[in-house]
A protein has these predicted regions:
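Short beta-strand segments of immunoglobulin-like
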Residues: 114-120, 240-246, 286-288
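Short, solvent-exposed loop/linker segments at beta-strand-coil boundaries, enriched for Pro/Gly
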Residues: 147-157, 273-286
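Short acidic, flexible loop segments centered on an aromatic residue
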Residues: 135-150, 263-276
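Short proline/glycine- and polar residue-rich coil/turn motifs
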Residues: 120-122, 159-168, 287-295
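Short, surface-exposed loop/turn segments at beta-strand-coil junctions that are enriched for proline
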Residues: 74-78, 88-90, 162-164, 173-181, ...
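C-terminal edge strands of extracellular/lumenal beta-sandwich accessory domains
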Residues: 1-137, 143-145, 177-179, 188-204, ...
């Protein structure tokens, strides 16, 4: 895409790493990619600046505490250490009162499902998202499993919040002949992760009340390429995700198409829930478009060389003004299973 740099935010605010405070930057100010080094490291001069990171901040780096500060401190050596709380402006007085809490870290997480109480159209899909609230430095992957989906419906599962990320999105689908009185009371959503060497399982809220609505104006289909054309699977056969395999460092062709049911307008689409390092290649700021009165268009996935082997459910979603891949409340396609696999024909050296 045209954007040269993408920023990951925390609830719409800039996230600061290394317990630093968010600051404003002037136009054309240099930006550096940094690598943390422990105290006492011998740094080879290379012409680039060296930054000393002190244990100090004004606002918590994850932006969860408003104007309050938070530091994560690991003593580099045995000794006595002092904590100092001051006004950042250097002001002081008898009414400048602060509260200081010192405690051990308790890494944990919670997950919230958004896009609840959806209205689904027969044969179509609606997006939902799962947002992770990470605590006290836990940055590992989180797996979400959805079970108990009634017959005639499908939900993306399992889903994975990747290490260091806070969002994954899925697609909830209704068959063309889905029943309006389906029993959703048995649906369970669980999140599992390894925290501190122990497996932790948390329950997650479910979809709530799912309503079967009227026929959609169009249905979006995401499919692999088959001999230069889309697979063209029948809508009634969308029971299990089709598979698409990509090799790190390469591109692979896929197709977006629409079954129009009275709507011939331009359709703007994005691809959501791709693995970190996999993008839709060679597109502009408008994303992927199916033009007015047209029904299909090809596009290409590209995977960076460093992407690890994995399986991930992804889907197309009608474009929104959001800055992230949150599918909540958006019309989506039935998901496909994107498989990232190393090229086994390459001889190791």
């Amino acid at each position: 895409p045209d954007g040269g740099t993408f920023f990951y935010t925390s609830n719409g605010m800039r996230r600061s790493y290394f317990d630093t405070s968010a600051t404003a930057h002037t136009l054309d100010e240099p930006c550096y990619v940094v690598e943390p080094k422990p105290l006492g490291s011998a740094l080879v001069p290379n012409g680039l600046p060296v930054f000393t990171m002190n244990y100090a901040n004004d606002d918590a780096g994850d932006r969860k505490l408003g104007r309050d500060s938070r530091l994560t401190f690991t003593a580099p050596a045995d000794g006595r250490y002092a904590v100092r709380v001051t006004d950042t402006r250097g002001w002081s007085g008898p009414r400048f009162v602060y509260a200081l809490l010192v405690r051990p870290v308790l890494p944990d997480f919670s997950i919230q499902l958004t896009g609840v109480n959806p209205t689904l159209s027969p044969g179509a899909s609606m997006g939902f998202a799962l947002k992770a609230d990470r605590r006290d430095g836990f940055e590992g992957p989180i797996r979400i499993d959805i079970a108990g989906i009634p017959e005639g419906y499908f939900a993306s599962s399992p889903l994975m919040v990747e290490a260091g990320h806070t969002l994954t999105s899925g697609s909830l689908h209704a068959d063309p002949n889905a029943k309006a009185d389906a029993d959703w009371s048995k649906v369970t959503v669980t999140a599992t992760a390894t925290v501190g060497g122990k497996e932790i399982v948390h329950e997650v809220n479910n979809f709530g009340k799912v309503t079967l609505g009227p026929e959609p104006k169009f249905i979006v289909v995401l499919e692999p390429d088959q001999n230069g054309k889309p697979v063209m699977r029948m809508l009634a056969d969308e029971k299990k995700p089709l598979e698409l395999t990509i090799t790190p460092g390469q591109t692979v062709k896929a197709w977006l198409r629409t079954v129009r049911l009275g709507n011939d307008a331009l359709i703007n689409l994005d691809i959501h829930n791709l693995p970190h390092g996999v993008i839709v290649d060679d597109i502009g700021l408008n994303g992927v478009q199916i033009r007015e009165k047209e029904n299909e268009r090809p596009f290409f996935f590209r995977a960076a060389k460093w992407v690890q082997d994995q399986d991930r459910l992804c889907h197309a979603a009608v474009s929104s003004a959001r800055a992230d891949a949150d599918s909540s409340g958006l019309q989506t396609s039935f998901p496909i299973l994107l498989k990232v696999r190393k090229d086994v024909t390459v001889t190791a050296k």
